[in-house]
Amino acid sequence: VAYCHEMLPVRPGDHIVSMLPLGHVFGMVYDFLYGFSAGAHLYFLTRMPSPKIIAQSFSEIRPRVISCVPLIVEKIIKKDILPRIDNKIGKLLLRMPIVNDKIKADMRKKAMEVFGSNFDEIIIGGAPFNAEVERFLKQIGFPYTIAYGMTECGPIICYEDWTRFKPGSCGKAAPRMEVKILSSDPENIPGEIVCRGPNIMLGYYKNDEATVQVLDKDGWLHTGDLA
């Protein structure tokens, strides 16, 4: 929670839409504790969060920060934004330099409006992001970023501000976190991602056997993920 406030401060009176399951650490931290600890106004969806309901809530509530899984962004962008240019005329206009910039600015404005127009950035995590949608968002300069984490890390491991974020990545090691790839040649040979920091769990509750399988004697958490 402290890191959330460091990377993207939320102020008293700001609005946050809580739509992630609070039984998961991503939802509990980003959709509840993050805003609650800053005195923000939290809005809980009372119906199943379909893309239509979520888009409507964004429009009415105008949240300051949005945290969500990739599927939500993908469905909203594919339904409300991409169809506007996913045709022969749209693709032709995108090849024309001056018109290209105008279309991108217009698409960015419309995409921002769909999500309430008042947010600093959208933090996406929890699953792989659709490459087509990501290319489009980067092309129009939309403020999104993709973070990487897991429950055992409470949950953040990697993050980068959207202005420095590189497409296809999930940010860089968060402050006070150490991250490395167990490989003889990390740039060319995949290896397991391991991390170490003050936010790493102490261990699994009453399950020492499972704990020693993921936490080594030097405090490195073995994520089981490859990079």
Regions picked out by a protein language model, each given a short descriptive name:
Residues 38-39, 61, 139-141, 175:
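Short, structured coil segments at secondary-structure junctions
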Residues 64-67, 77-165:
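Gly/Ser/Thr-rich phosphate-binding loop
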Residues 126-128, 132-134, 138-139, 157-161, ...:
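Active-site glycine/GP-rich loop and adjacent strand/helix microenvironment
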Residues 187-227:
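Conserved ATP-binding/catalytic segment of the ANL
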Residues 12-13, 118-119, 190, 217-218:
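Phosphate-coordination loops involved in phosphoryl transfer and adenosine-cofactor binding
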Residues 71-74, 127-128, 199:
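Alpha-helix/helix-capping structural signal
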Residues 171, 179-181, 225-227:
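A structural signal for short hydrophobic beta-strand segments in well-ordered beta-sheet cores
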Residues 2-15, 22-109:
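Conserved AMP-binding/adenylation subdomain of ANL enzymes
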